[in-house]
Curated annotation (Swiss-Prot):
Pfam families: NAD_Gly3P_dh_C, NAD_Gly3P_dh_N. GO terms for cellular component: cytosol. This is Glycerol-3-phosphate dehydrogenase [NAD(P)+]. It comes from Synechococcus sp. (strain RCC307). It comes from the Bacteria.
Length: 301
């Protein structure tokens, strides 16, 4: 059944999703920031909204539409709000408590999807009926959707892998080799599990598309902004220079700071996140960060 869908956010991911949904036969309208708040009203009649703004814009966007009638919103923003540590779906729910919110996350590099290459992703939420309906309505031959009932774990995995992709970019930029990259990503998965467990997500979510799937895509491909940012840091650029060279939102940066701060409060062992945070602050060089990781106390895996 064709739906009227409003896509909030016209960046790479929002534009890609709008294209996929249009190809699936839906009537799609997209709102970009440059359109201004008045143009947003054109999406008020949408049956489903897709939230694809950068995470920093979610709270403001939610405030603008909270007076609309309730309808499903598919939250696609990956990261944690640096001021509150909340996920995108939590920000949507805070402003629009009566709206059903589901999470879309997975190994979805926008440029590959724009080329017509296949991909899969996860729809996560607690309303099985809604999930099943949206799964059937939004899946296409190119873009296959699975579903799970762990939206928090799905969302956290999508946020955390951005931090690990920065670390992987640094590792590859230093030309440390395949062994080092494999070791880093394996320990990254364990670190992500620590955070998921501590915040109430399910650790088994990490072994699906939203976890290891997204991690492998984002932490190994130069198409990933977070990975490219890490490469730039390894080349000796500072934080601002690296951001300017990437030229697009790098969600791993504010997410790293939020997770590192939370980890210190909770006394979690998050050595990769902590090392990346110190790099971002300019307190460590890439080589010093590597040395710090390699000199940690020996223990059981």
């Amino acid at each position: 059944m064709a739906l009227t869908i409003g896509v909030l956010g016209g960046g790479a991911w929002g534009s890609t999703l709008a294209g996929l949904l249009s190809q699936g036969g839906h009537r799609v309208q997209i709102w970009r920031r440059e359109h201004g708040p008045q143009a947003l009203q054109a999406l008020a009649a949408s049956e489903v909204l897709v939230g694809a703004t950068a995470l920093v814009g979610v709270s403001g966007m939610a405030q603008q539409i909270k007076g609309w009638s309730a309808r499903p919103i598919v939250s696609c923003s990956k990261g944690l709000d640096p001021s509150s540590g909340q996920t995108a779906s939590a920000l949507w729910k805070a402003a629009c408590p009566l709206w059903p919110v589901v999470v879309l996350s997975g190994p979805n590099l926008a440029s590959e999807l724009q080329q017509g290459l296949p991909a899969a992703s996860v729809l996560a939420g607690h309303d099985e009926g809604l999930l099943s309906t949206l799964q059937q309505q939004l899946s296409t031959e190119q873009f296959r959707l699975y579903r799970n009932n762990d939206p928090l774990g799905t969302e956290l995995a999508g946020a955390l892998k951005n931090v690990m992709a920065v670390a992987a970019g640094i590792c590859d930029g230093l030309q440390l080799g395949a062994n080092a990259r494999a070791s880093l990503l394996t320990r990254a998965l364990a670190e992500m599990a620590t955070v998921l467990h501590g915040l109430g997500g399910r650790q088994d979510t990490l072994y699906g598309l939203a976890g290891i799937g997204d991690l492998l895509a984002t932490a190994t491909s130069p198409l990933s902004r977070n990975y490219r940012f890490g490469l730039c840091m390894a080349d000796g650029l500072d934080r601002q220079q690296a951001l300017e060279k990437v030229g697009a939102t790098v969600e791993g940066v504010p997410t790293c700071e939020a997770i590192a701060s939370l980890g210190r409060q909770k006394q979690w062992s998050l050595p990769i996140t902590e090392s990346v945070a110190l790099l971002l602050q300019g307190a460590l060089s890439p080589a010093q960060a590597l040395q710090q990781l390699m000199q940690r106390e020996l223990r059981c895996e």
